[in-house]
Amino acid sequence: MIISAASDYRAAAQRILPPFLFHYIDGGAYAEYTLKRNVEDLSQVALRQRVLKNMSDLSLETTLFNETLSMPVALGPVGLCGMYARRGEVQAARAASAKGIPFTLSTVSVCPIEEVAPVMNRPMWFQLYVLRDRGFMRNALERAKAAGCSTLVFTVDMPTPGARYRDAHSGMSGTNAAMRRYWQAVTHPQWAWDVGLNGRPHDLGNISAYLGKPTGLEDYIGWLANNFDPSISWKDLEWIREFWDGPMVIKGILDPEDARDAVRFGADGIVVSNHGGRQLDGVLSSARALPAIADAVKGDITILADSGIRNGLDVVRMIALGADSVLLGRAYLYALATHGEKGVANLLNLIEKEMRVAMTLTGAKSIKEITRESLVPSPEFTSVLADLPAASAKPKQDDAA
């Protein structure tokens, strides 16, 4: 199969993966309205073409949390990566490190912190949820710090799991799920050999290290369901600051007021995100939410964005809408499932090339030159910004908590 875009990796991954794994990452919450709008809204953002600008010295390099990135992209946290390729987190981390960008390890990764961090030539990022088991949280933070992780990505949009109907149909959950998964595995021989047989242990490495016993897929579903904490508040983040003195990024912001709260709290960054449309269906796409949030807090806090990003054009669009950098999720997992580390490396090269083309043809020589001026207020773009809540003034210095 010819691979020329991220969409090709998705098609390839669908053939390789057992349905329960493909649909787990490909699907969203409820009717998947927000999942679709993430991609559609972003694709409607029109770039302003400029010519004769002498783009010979174009650079994608940027700085984020005192780290130099070869381009404004990081691999975001995705659970169960090691079920999509043999020791998947390790392979993805190697590809990111070789490209000069961050890799973010999920709390619910297959490979533990101690296995992934050493393969990188730059500090790893670590993602954490607020969970009822505060002992686990403290243990994870201490281990991440000991492994040299530089940045904590704190996911706050999962006080309860979203309703993902696809999972019940695909075999990830529901009646006779284990038997259905087994049958799917034996009928997908490439995955069965690479991951099913040779990718063991199929374990939640970070959780197993804490509990002192193996944890499989059923444990993953049950442990998380019982540990998400609906009482989460800003006080929990204050508690985390006792154990983490590095950069902290709050992931799951969709409202300008929450963004202002993150500034008041003293967070180093936010991720404008709806969890890839996997939590609450019907909320704003990240592309719709981002401009008002940027108007409210740009310059006061680092802004990252995810959800709906499929190529280098989308990266440029998100930056023009107000992001400083972006996180990739599904796009790199499809590539990982298809060709492992080489697939992720190739995807990142494709994204870089697409960004260079977009920047060359919009006259932006550097990431800082990608602004709202890089966009044209076409009918499609206007529809993306329509009905956004008006951004009020930034909080005064005296208002900071």
UniProtKB/Swiss-Prot annotation:
It is an enzyme of class 1 (oxidoreductase). InterPro entries: Aldolase_TIM (IPR013785), Alpha-hydoxy_acid_DH_FMN (IPR012133), FMN-dep_DH (IPR000262), FMN_HAD (IPR037396), FMN_hydac_DH_AS (IPR008259), LldD (IPR020920). Its cofactor is FMN. It is a peripheral membrane protein. It is found in: Cell inner membrane. The keyword Metal-binding does not apply. It catalyses: (S)-lactate + A = pyruvate + AH2. Belongs to the FMN-dependent alpha-hydroxy acid dehydrogenase family. Catalyzes the conversion of L-lactate to pyruvate. Is coupled to the respiratory chain. This is L-lactate dehydrogenase. It comes from Cronobacter sakazakii (strain ATCC BAA-894).
